[in-house]
Regions:
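Helix-loop-helix hairpin linking two adjacent transmembrane segments in secondary transporters
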Residues: 1-31
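Multi-pass alpha-helical transporter architecture, strongest
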Residues: 19-27, 216-236
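Juxtamembrane intracellular "pre-TM" segments in multi-pass secondary transporters
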Residues: 26-60
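Extracytoplasmic gate region of multi-pass secondary transporters
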Residues: 53-108
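Helix-to-loop junctions at the C-terminal end of transmembrane segments
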Residues: 107-119, 203-204
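Structural signature of the two symmetry-related core transmembrane helices
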Residues: 122-137, 216
């Protein structure tokens, strides 16, 4: 038997590999962390880096919430839509989700590198704005190749600002980096579950095609919000 939930046991393999990589990198991670602690302590003693813009943080978290809602909604409702309304088989529909998520990994890496060269605002605004085009095209794709192309671009752009937003919020909260990480990676992304649930209710009420065709509005809204957020001078 080729498919089935019994194959989930093979996910142990990447977990073991990740454990080995982390164990190997742990000495270097500890060294970097100790350097940061010393540097942060010096800032606290000198009174530097204490200013926090709570309004900027709020809008950054709102941006992350919208981005995560779109990302989670697409890979949640994608297979349902293409199987029910486009007649795709289970394997093809599931492959679309894998392509969407894998291109997100590539987009995160590219976005982080470009952020160092172009600045965080251009990546945060530009990436999610560009994602609205393929996301809007996804529900209109009728052929598997067109759907794969659309979800590839959507997955690449929608999440490519992930690392950048984490760093920006950490810079906004220089003395609370742990909390900044929790707010960006935990709270805001976790709240996307509420957004997905809301869109699910709308899909049940008005139909999944209408919701998927309208979801491209959220990236545009997020891009507008991000364009108005003052960036910390340390990373401009």
């Amino acid at each position: 038997q080729e498919g089935g939930l019994h194959n989930c046991i093979y996910f142990i393999i990447p977990g073991i590999i990740a454990f080995g990589v982390l164990q190997y990198a742990m000495p270097e991670l500890k060294r970097v962390n100790n350097e940061y602690v010393k540097k942060n302590a010096a800032k606290e003693n000198s009174g530097a880096g204490m200013s926090i813009s709570y309004i900027s943080i709020f809008f950054m978290l709102l941006y992350i919430f919208l981005r995560s809602t779109v990302h989670s909604s697409v890979h949640t409702y994608l297979p349902i839509y293409f199987m029910k309304f486009r007649g795709f088989d289970t394997v093809t529909a599931s492959t679309l989700v894998s392509i969407f998520l894998l291109n997100g990994v590539l987009g995160t890496d590219c976005g982080a590198r470009l952020s160092d060269k172009l600045g965080p605002r251009k990546i945060i605004v530009g990436s999610i704005l560009l994602s609205s085009l393929p996301i809007g095209f996804v529900p209109h794709a009728t052929a598997p190749w067109a759907a794969m192309l659309a979800v590839s671009l959507a997955g690449f752009f929608i999440i490519s600002s992930f690392a950048t937003t984490v760093v920006v919020v950490q810079t906004m909260m220089p003395n609370n980096v742990g909390m900044a990480s929790g707010l960006t990676i935990g709270f805001s992304i976790g709240m996307a579950g509420f957004g997905v649930t809301t869109l699910g209710y709308l899909a049940d009420t008005y139909g999944l095609p209408i919701v998927l065709k309208s979801i491209c509005i959220l990236p545009i809204l997020a891009a507008f919000i991000a364009s108005r957020i003052p960036m910390p001078k340390e990373i401009k």
